[in-house]
Amino acid sequence: MSERTYSQVNTGISVREASFVSPSQFEQLLASPSSESREGLLQGTPYALDSHEIKDLSALEARLMTALLAEYQWAFEVSPQSDLVSLFTLKYTYHNLKVYLKHKATERKLGHLLIPIGPYSLDVLEHLVATFSAEHCPAFMAEEVAATWQEFQDYQDLRVLEIGMDLAYFKHLRYLGDSLDHPILKQLVDVTIDFYNAITVKRALDQQKPHSFMHQLLSDEGSLSAHQVIDLLESGQWLTWFYQVNPLEYDLALETYEEKMRTGQLKTVELEYLESLVKFSLLD
């Protein structure tokens, strides 16, 4: 992925970024005293709403989703490598597979939960779940869906569908990261999986769950194995864990989180914030 290949795309991104809500605009929105003033602040952005729509959560969600769909559609259209965009949309693909699997298991109408973002259409994903056929997607996707469905048949527990697709997502994410063969993208995949594992272990420890519970939820696709993550975090070695998974050089913004790790006071929500911070800094 050379700079020359993406130079035109980067220009297009710069133009589109100019229409986004800026940090200062966002702060103004938070401090805005009325729907009318928020309407004015949103004019000229992809999220323009009138004062009545702003009060309607359904209308607000629909507008945000429309804007999100438009951005990803544009990204797929202009990117010289669609897999690069897929790296960021894959979470929607596996969310949709969960929805279709749950529909298959319960026969409940869940279509309102589908998010039509990603390289595979909803029709392709629905067909995949119905037939376990790999006609329009990689064979390993069909294998993971079929294996997850078989496990559900054995245990009759909907949580199996959630866990199976989460772990399949991380395997697919690792595959994409390796195939794109760019150090920053490989680090991004590591960070995504490493933080998922850590957040999962943190919640499990807070709830005093056993090792067996943790192991069934964790992925071995990160930079540390599930066993290593459990051993480190169960013994309170949060800082050791972070030093091993953090791809960034020294950053003053991380000090607060590191101190809380050192004193054992880091909360789950702070760990989630830290993941976002590391990813943002990595891609900046």
What spans do the regions from the language model cover?
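Extended alpha-helical surfaces
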Residues: 1-284
